A protein has these predicted regions:
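A glycine-centered beta->alpha junction motif in the catalytic cores
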Residues: 100, 118-130, 176-180
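A cross-family kinase active-site recognition segment
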Residues: 131-181
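Juxta-kinase regulatory segment immediately upstream of eukaryotic protein kinase catalytic domains
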Residues: 8-34
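ATP-binding glycine-rich phosphate-binding loop
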Residues: 33-49
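Active-site beta-strand termini and strand-to-loop segments that position acidic
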Residues: 51-54
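Glycine-rich ATP phosphate-binding loop
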Residues: 60
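A conserved alpha-helical element in kinase catalytic cores
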Residues: 63-110, 130, 135-139
Length: 181
């Protein structure tokens, strides 16, 4: 398991279950010594923020929900490390805390642990915002998907064996909920 530091952020109490922009600014300043503007981003599980540092660099700040699985965080960290060593396309990189770790733990206002990670920012457009989606774009997506797949052939982690609801090969669960779609 990746080293996780218990930093000075343990003394900061988060105001609620969600993370405000002000709290995200404080978290990134205390744990990564980075100051700048913060923009809230959508996310499935983690609270995500784009950090635009005063030094001109952009980052992705990821703050877990309470009661996160440490194996899940370790999986994500090791996955990015593996891809950065084995993939020819640009992949976000794990950034180190001021303590030299790839993640740290903070406490929320109810005393629950949350994992914090900072990644390099990768510029690009969301697929949903691209218009028109043409043959060239589809070919590029397919090529990059193949590159990622090849790069992951030798990646092993116990957490990669779990079932994911949105995995198309595990989609039969929706059959009993089709009226909700």
């Amino acid at each position: 398991i990746t080293k996780i530091s218990i930093s000075v952020m343990n003394q900061m109490v988060l105001e609620n279950s969600k993370i405000s922009i002000k709290e995200a600014q404080k978290i990134v300043a205390v744990n990564y010594d980075i100051k700048g503007s913060v923009e809230k981003l959508d996310g499935e599980i983690d609270f995500n923020f784009k950090i635009q540092s005063t030094k001109g660099k952009n980052y992705l700040l990821k703050i877990s929900r309470p009661n996160f699985e440490s194996d899940y965080i370790d999986f994500q960290i090791k996955l990015l490390d593996h891809l950065n060593k084995n993939c020819e396309i640009e992949i976000a990189e794990n950034k180190l805390t001021i303590d030299g770790n790839k993640s740290c733990i903070i406490k929320d206002n109810q005393g629950r642990d949350r994992s914090v990670r900072l990644l390099s920012w990768t510029e690009g457009r969301l697929w949903s915002s691209v218009n028109p989606i043409n043959q060239s774009l589809r070919k590029g997506l397919g090529s990059n998907t193949a590159i990622l797949t090849r790069s992951l052939i030798n990646f092993k982690h116990s957490f990669s064996k779990r079932e994911i609801e949105w995995d198309i090969s595990n989609s039969l669960w929706v059959e009993h909920h089709i009226d909700k779609f």
